[in-house]
Swiss-Prot record:
Stated role: Converts the aldose L-fucose into the corresponding ketose L-fuculose.
Protein name: L-fucose isomerase
GO CC annotations, alphabetized: cytoplasm
Reactions listed under catalytic activity: L-fucose = L-fuculose
Gene name of this polypeptide: fucI
Keywords: Carbohydrate metabolism, Cytoplasm, Fucose metabolism, Isomerase, Manganese, Metal-binding
Length: 591
């Protein structure tokens, strides 16, 4: 089957159409803006899969309806999913704008004095607002000379932020969320909302019973040679942790081997269900070889599977990581307990950064007073105001140990195309695989156990659905924290020390939900959250605006907030603007 092509970014150079001197004097400068924009994006961006982003420039500058239509025809034939219109001069507003209502769009009006690029920008944005097709405004802070072909830093930041978020929108459109199973233990996020996926994300939901996973394992609907490779890889790389089960629940060596084999098979089969596997077609299993075109998935597990079969912890953790027995590769997005809304937050984070995501319970707020009472030691540094314990038995990516290193040698989580095999091995070496606790998981399994290094910047996010309002997004930028070993051991032992831990300290503002760490925990909208590497809350805000998802909680500096220009017409309070604009325009793919 032909592989679906990646979305491209279309660059639209627009120009004053008056011939006999005006247009001719602007052709080169206008087209150079388009070429510079394309070069910037091509150099500095990649798709989440690691492929270079392609830009498509209109064949000619656009002065009116005819050239605009010719540009649209070219873009339609080349899978353009995002557009950036550029100009250094006055042009004819509504005659030259991109009118596709579902395609993210921005306009860069050159800040120069010779020609009124700012005037076109304002006129075009007014047309967008009047027609109900929001667009992002890009206008440099400082005046440039007409022959200056450089892109100022503030313009570059907006171009790249818009492009990252726009490509995320385009990449999700037409894909599916694979729901393996149904509702897990009454968790609301696993009550998968088809309307949300269809209307806000442009995605479908593929619902598959967990018996399909059972069938694939039992009937050997997988690559048997790959299974042997996966087992050999696990034998080489897995370190096993303490078995905390009572003696009557401990498994013997043969039973543990069977659990490991099934856990790896679950990873293989869920992957094949998501993206397909041509090896299955070679076995005559053509239907199964196609997969479900899934860009994200969730596995119910508890309790209808886990009371009898090995849990999904190993499968989920490996799929969400940037490496496995096939080497370093793009992480998948698989939500434990089929929490589709946390899965969407994971999907957003992966699409924006290309990195693996940490899925976790937002489990416990530890106040400085409580920590000192329990451990006899005081919190300090980033942790001085308290910490949140992020921990879950399931799908935290092994990258979350933060054994990868940035250019300064600091711990981080890299995009998969930057990860070396040595860094992947270091993450594996920092992970123990602990037998699942029988009281929770009667069918057994292995949970990954690691501790995230401290001082790493993270952004915690979550999507929630509110009846009568729709989806909302929560964002909390902060840092991982490294506690003294004795303190960590005492606190960790009070929950489940066989699971991966990240100690998280959000950045406080002294206001609202970020008054203190307790308020962050108290205002979090669900039991799960996602950690994405870096302080990238501004990118999430831009993406949410494109999808018409209001942000109900964030601690991003106001200067970094970048939304369509029409948001400013929805009141004077910046967050109220967001709610009113999202309500006014409705979901991007409204039905």
């Amino acid at each position: 089957m032909k592989k679906i092509s990646l979305p491209k970014i279309g660059i639209r150079p627009v120009i004053d159409g008056r011939r006999m001197g005006v247009r001719e004097s602007l052709e080169e400068q206008t087209m150079n803006m388009a070429k510079a924009t394309a070069a910037l994006i091509t150099e500095k961006m990649r798709h989440a899969c690691g492929a270079q982003v392609e830009c498509v420039i209109a064949d000619t500058c656009i002065a009116g309806m005819a050239e605009s239509a010719a540009c649209e025809e070219k873009f339609s034939s080349q899978n353009v999913g995002v557009t950036i219109t550029v100009t250094p001069c006055w042009c004819y507003g509504s005659e030259t704008i991109d009118m596709d209502p579902m395609r993210p769009k921005a306009i860069w009006g050159f800040n120069g004095t010779e020609r009124p690029g700012a005037v076109y920008l304002a006129a075009a944005l007014a047309a967008h607002s009047q027609k109900g097709i929001p667009a992002f405004s890009i206008y440099g802070h400082d005046v440039q000379d007409a022959d200056d072909t450089s892109i100022p830093a503030d313009v570059e930041e907006k171009l790249l932020r818009f492009a990252r978020a726009g490509l995320a929108v385009a990449s999700m459109k037409g894909k599916s969320y694979l729901s393996v199973g149904g509702v897990s233990m009454g968790i609301a996020g696993s009550i998968v909302d088809h309307n949300f996926f269809e209307s806000w994300l442009g995605m479908k939901v593929q619902a598959v019973d967990m018996t399909e996973l059972r069938r694939r394992i039992d009937q050997k609907i997988y690559d048997e040679a790959e299974l042997e490779m996966a087992l050999a890889w696990a034998d080489k790389n897995f370190r096993y942790g303490e078995d905390q089960n009572a003696s009557q629940y401990k498994r013997n060596e043969a039973q543990n081997r069977a659990v490991l084999k099934e856990s790896l098979l679950m990873a293989m089969c869920i992957r094949d269900m998501m993206q397909g596997n041509k090896t299955l077609a070679d076995k005559g299993l053509v239907e199964e070889s196609l997969g479900y075109n899934a860009i994200a998935a969730g596995f119910q597990g508890q309790r209808h599977w886990t009371d009898q079969y090995p849990n999904g912890d190993t499968a989920e953790a490996l799929l969400n990581s940037s490496f496995d027995w096939n080497g370093v590769r793009e992480p998948f997005v698989v939500a434990t307990e089929n929490d589709s809304l946390n899965g969407v937050a994971m999907l957003f984070g992966h699409q924006l950064t290309g990195t693996a995501q940490i899925f976790a319970d937002v489990r416990t707020y530890w106040s400085p007073e409580a920590v000192e009472r329990v451990t006899g030691q005081a919190l300090s540094g980033l942790a001085e105001h308290g910490i949140i314990h992020l921990i879950n038995s399931g799908s935290a990516a092994l990258d979350g140990a933060c054994k990868q290193r940035d250019s300064e040698g600091k711990p981080t989580m890299k995009p998969h195309w930057e990860i070396s095999q040595q860094e992947a091995d270091a993450c594996l070496a920092a992970t123990e695989w602990c037998p699942a606790i029988h009281e929770y998981f009667r069918g057994g399994g292995y949970s990954s156990r690691f501790l995230t290094e401290g001082g790493v910047p993270f952004t915690m996010t979550r999507v929630n659905i509110i009846k009568g309002l729709g989806p909302v997004l929560q964002i909390a930028e902060g840092w991982s924290v490294e506690l003294p070993k004795a303190m960590h051991d005492q606190l960790d032992a009070r929950t489940n020390s066989t699971w991966p831990t990240t100690w998280f300290a959000p950045r406080l503002t002294g206001k609202g939900p970020f008054t203190d760490v307790y308020s962050v925990m108290a205002n979090w909208g669900a039991n799960h959250g996602v950690l994405t590497i870096g302080h990238v809350g501004a990118d999430f805000i831009t993406l949410a605006a494109m999808l018409r998802i209001p942000v109900c909680m964030h601690n991003v500096e106001e200067a970094k907030i970048y939304r369509p220009s029409a948001w400013a017409a929805h009141g004077m309070d910046i967050e109220g603007q967001d709610y009113r604009a999202c309500q006014n325009y409705g979901p991007l793919y409204k039905r």
